[in-house]
Amino acid sequence: MPKYVEGVELTQEGMHAIFARMGYGDITSGSIYNGVPTIDTGALNRQGFMPVLTGVGPHRDSGHWIMLIKGPGNQYYLFDPLGKTSGEGYQNILAAQLPMGSTLSVIPNGSGLNMGLCGYWVASAGLRAHQALNQHNPPTLLNVGQTITNEMRNELDHDGYRKITGWLRAVADEFPEGDPQLDGKALRENTEKDLKIEIPTLVLPGKDTSPKEMSVKPTAPQDKSVPVWNGFSLYTDDTVKAAAQYAYDNYLGKPYTGSVESAPANFGGRMVYRQHHGLSHTLRTMAYAELIVEEARKAKLRGETLGKFKDGRTIADVTPQELKKIMIAQAFFVAGRDDEASDAKNYQKYHEQSRDAFLKYVKDNESTLIPDVFKDQEDVNFYARVIEDKSHDWESTPAHVLINQGHMVDLVRVKQPPESFLQRYFSSMQRWIGSQATEAVFGIQRQFFHATYEVVAGFDSDNKEPHLVVSGLGRYVIGEDGQPIREAPKKGQKEGDLKVFPQTYKLKENERLMRVDEFLKLPEIQNTFPGSGKHLQGGMPGMNEMDYWNRLNSLNRARCENDVDFCLKQLQTAHDKAKIEPIKQAFQSSKGKERRQPNVDEIAAARIIQQILANPDCIHDDHVLINGQKLEQQFFRDLLAKCEMAVVGSLLNDTDIGNIDTLMRHEKDTEFHSTNPEAVPVKIGEYWINDQRINNSSGNITQKKHDLIFLMQNDAWYFSRVNAIAQNRDKGSTFKEVLITTLMTPLTSKALVDTSQAKPPTRLFRGLNLSEEFTKGLIDQANAMIANTTERLFTDHSPEAFKQIKLNDLSKMSGRTNASTTTEIKLVKETWDSNVIFEMLDPDGLLHSKQVGRHGEGTESEFSVYLPEDVALVPVKVTLDGKTQKGENRYVFTFVAVKSPDFTPRHESGYAVEPFLRMQAAKLAEVKSSIEKAQRAPDLETIFNLQNEVEAVQYSHLSTGYKNFLKNTVGPVLENSLSGLMESDTDTLSKALAAFPSDTQWSAFNFEEARQAKRQMDAIKQMVGNKVVLDALTQCQDALEKQNIAGALDALKKIPSEKEMGTIRRELREQIQSARQELESLQRAVVTPVVTDEKKVRERYDALIENTSKKITELETGKLPNLDAVKKGISNLSNLKQEVTVLRNEKIRMHVGTDKVDFSDVEKLEQQIQVIDTKLADAYLLEVTKQISALDNTKPKNQTELKTKIAAFLDRTTDIEMLRNERIKKHGSSKDPLDLSDLDKLSGSLQRINQSLVSDLITTIRVSINQMEAKTFHEQEKEIQQNFELLAKLEKTLDKSKTSEKLREDIPKLNDLLVAKQKAYPQMVQMQLKSEVFVTQLREVCQANHDDLDKTRNARLRELDRLDREAGITRMVGNLIWGLTNKVGLTTDERLDIRTKQQSLARFKNELFNDKIDTDQLISNLARKRPSELQEGLGISTDNAMELHLLLTELAGKTTSPDELEERMKAIDDISTKIGREPEHLKFVMVEEDESNKKTIGF
């Protein structure tokens, strides 16, 4: 690997080497590592300057070079190749490193010129700035900045970027020997020749035949999901924060009362009372809980298997409400500590006191916590028991795990040896959330430690210390044989578990304690612990030991222990960074923030756009015609799709803005259509002209720019269409709409750049309204990316993150257009009522957002973003944010802007420059034709004759001066002209043309012979000049045909100056000059490399292809036991096809030069996929055939089984359709016959099943309609409608057979039946209500009858008792006698009859008053009673009882006939009136008294 240059950037070693080569000796450089500067001011003062490498950290070795410069006295300067704004970002932290009283000024050089060459600029422009600023009379800082800017721009002109990068690649391993040089530019220019660098000429191939990147389809799994989080977080929730503050105020911020390690610590002059179990520790444990749940959810989305609790849930299933309760409990988990003692007795005491503190807090705040947070007191008691930890149950529920694991994770900072504890705690968490998630937790834990100024321990797999068995604090022992001592193997074990020895164990001879390095090499550890063989640096990387010690004891450490807000902010910053860093690690880094420089096609596009704007007459209805070149709709779509229009806009000028008026006058009647088909089209030209007449009659350019921006904001008809066209998702757009979009998009971008004054915000919102289905897809794609971007600890997961982001990238939704955004989330939530919100985080200023200007109050919050090609918006969070005003779920997608060459699409070149060059060729051909028409063939005789005359003059009487003039000046010109014309030697002719004597020279000879000679010479000069021009134009045409821009320019340079070619018409000279300028503009093009870190790209590709190959092999060898397995295999194969496409694209991107791309590794995978595809297709057909056969034999017994069969049928129909489409797709354009007979046979079987299902469903629906009742009408109606929907699906798949047509005829009849039922529904409801009222009336009649009879019975019984007394018979004797006489039939016991009747009537009443059955059942029960029972039970007449019995019988029979319902309701009214008018209750009537039995009564 090159040691001096990585990509196009100097490494730290390279920076030192270039300065040594220039003669500056062994310099000292500085750095800013992880935000912490390291500057040796002594070395800075000795050297006079110091290169400083910024932006490096634990996971980033390369960064950005800047330079500190020592000026006079205490004056220092800072040079940043990115420009003054970037440099100001380092000003404060670097000024703090300089001597007291120093001043650090930033050199105000321009931006946009770095081009990723910061190291080179430091060694060149930086050194020249140092020299200028240390002169005796130095220039002003402003002049230095301007000079540097001009020098950098001049170096980049004329293909400078490729020259510089070519030189850097040439010196990547070694700088050539030679003399010292003043600066990097001088060194480059003095060594380029010796290095023999070949800078390829800018030649465009006639046709770009290199492989093209292919688009990929999202592979986000549909079957793996977690509920979208509602936004709850430790860092934003006031309830949790209040609990933490309470815990601090009352416990954690108080001094210990015990004696063990209870002395307070002084950090930065501030006291901390509980440095190990205080506020910082507590808040970190709460942060871990959120982090563990977050990473568990990611693991579930990745399809990993997580540990389950007794209720079947996992950590991934923890809800926001549950996590809130857990965090509140965590706030008090160590609040009860008296000191740092941890023995069993004190441990239990502390936890009881912590429990009491928690309970007291809840009681003190009961009104806000119950039931809003905790459901009830029992819920509170549960968490109190977890805090108490009486039974040391650490895994029963998520609360037990998160509270105890959170505490445990934080202990790593104070445990020794760290390797033993980290492995133990890692394995403890690993079972719950998996290995990758656990790595992420412990990786972010280190960032939390840094953020809260805690010590970060290293991890050394080679540690020779004795290993500590964390559980029980024991030891493992190596025995005499050099192997670990183990327990006896258990059943099924090959070898026993490691035997644990107490620390008091006395080693025997030849025994020793197992070391850490030995423990980590054990097979059982290596198989489960990814840290085996790995190393982690302790402390703060890049910081020396003393500085780190000072950091751990700083005031900020104390603030973390004493300030809840400060500590939470530190943790939140670290947590947010941990979500972003894994994304950046997955991609090649990009040092600059500025937009990339234009490529050759974008320059050509800008020139074409300028020509159209200046001359809109070239616009026709369906094309643009320029210099014979016909540009149709696809050309302009290519410009929108492949050019970065913001870059194109940077090449336009105010004249182009002014030409909008010209364009709009030409397009006065062109209609522009909104994407809403119901919207009225608007004539865009007429709109613009009227707007300018009213608002900008003076034609002010700045106002015109604002008006252009205002037009962009018009979503009613303009922007919706422009946005859709720009993103290639429009339908039915006209040519003019596509053309105007192409012209206006870069113009709008330029207007935004020119008018925006505000600093770009770091957070923007964009509101959208999307369908539920589309939103679900976005959530799945976002989750797939989020789940695979995890912080590393030991294992690099970045290749998988790269792949998932490439596969599921959502950036295209915000690309290719000037998207409107806002800094106010209320606007998108309340005003726009968006159901999807894109929250775009831009901490590095990569989006280049521009404020939308001065169009009314409130618009200062509006910003427009044209997403740069090399910037992606990568999701880091998806949040469920309540409901919209329409009741829809609102989702917030949080993205972070990340810049990398990996995002730059590799378009084929030439799509714009090829037609542009043809335009120039056509223009020059026209010039050449005009010159040829005016030019005669060269008259060589004229030259011969003049030569003879010149020779003859030597013998004439003319002056010696004239003779010498002809001999020395005219003669050679004639000779060269003749030679050049005869040999068609353009160089000789050019030299001759330049040597023709001037008019001034001729004026010295004022006689006729000289004047005659001059006239002849002028004619020859015109002849030679025209020949030179024609030859140059011919060469230029040849070069343009080969698309050799440099060759064409070289040819045009041979055309004589205006003075020398004065005989050519002015307009022709102007056309030549115009073509030259157009071609020269192309030479400013920059080819932005898509690979800047070859090592990273190669390693990433190797990891990806290894992983994909492994998955293909697993699929290849996997079993397919059933249809589900086959379908899963097909789904996996589909995803693998997309992964292979990503690999192919990466191979294309890695390709440089003209060599053929070696796709052999990718093609091998593609061949495997093809074999698997065939295997799966065969298995799919076989399993579907089995399923269809089984379906045919299934006989549904009820509606549920029928629906199951229908669902299976629809699935099989889809299966057959998929098989059919896939077979057609594979057959392609083959001329061989396509055999679908097997699928046709299966379709026939399905058709028979379909007819059976339709018939069954029709019957089911008819029965359901007939059984509809008023009280359950809507539920039944809903179910029937669902059945109708199923029926509609089935009907679509029915064929045209007679059986099917007959079934189709029955469907409308069902609908009519339902409609009739729906029409009868109001009367059914009325009937139901009347029935309920009627039952209530019957109950009243029954109750009245019962009460009257009860009174009569009681009176009669009292009367019988009186008669008994009067007869002198006691009750006992009487009962005995009557019992005997009753038994033999001589008498009747009136009392027994009364009681029997009483019980009968009570049963009737109880049945009537039974509230456990509904009204219909009650009526049905009454209908089964005899009229006599009704008469007795209700106390009504015989006639009414008979009439009531008939009515109840009718009511028990269901009907929906309006007439019948009406009749029944009338009958209810009639009988109600009759029984309401009575009741003539039955009374006891005395019968004729019998002397022998005075107790007989009759009814």
Swiss-Prot record:
Is able to ubiquitinate itself, but this modification is not required to ubiquitinate Rab33b. Changing C118A: Loss of deubiquitinase and deneddylase activity. No effect on ubiquitination activity. Is still able to restore the intracellular growth defect in D.discoideum exhibited by cells lacking all four members of the SidE family. Residues 760-1000 are annotated as: Mono-ADP-ribosyltransferase. The modification 5-glutamyl glutamate is found at E860. Transmembrane segments: none annotated. Induction: Expression is induced during the transition from exponential to stationary phase. Its EC number is 3.4.22.-, 2.3.2.-, 2.4.2.31. InterPro entries: SidE_DUB, SidE_mART, SidE_PDE. One of its GO terms (molecular function) is nucleotide binding. Changing N114A: Loss of deubiquitinase and deneddylase activity. The active site is at H64 (for deubiquitinase activity), D80 (for deubiquitinase activity), C118 (nucleophile). Residues 1059-1181 form a coiled coil. Keywords: Coiled coil, Glycosyltransferase, Hydrolase, Isopeptide bond, Multifunctional enzyme, NAD, Nucleotide-binding, Nucleotidyltransferase, Protease, Secreted, Thiol protease, Transferase, Ubl conjugation, Ubl conjugation pathway, Virulence. Contains an N-terminal deubiquitinase domain (DUB). The DUB domain does not interfere with the ubiquitin conjugation activity catalyzed by the central domain of SdeA, which causes toxicity. This is Ubiquitinating/deubiquitinating enzyme SdeA.
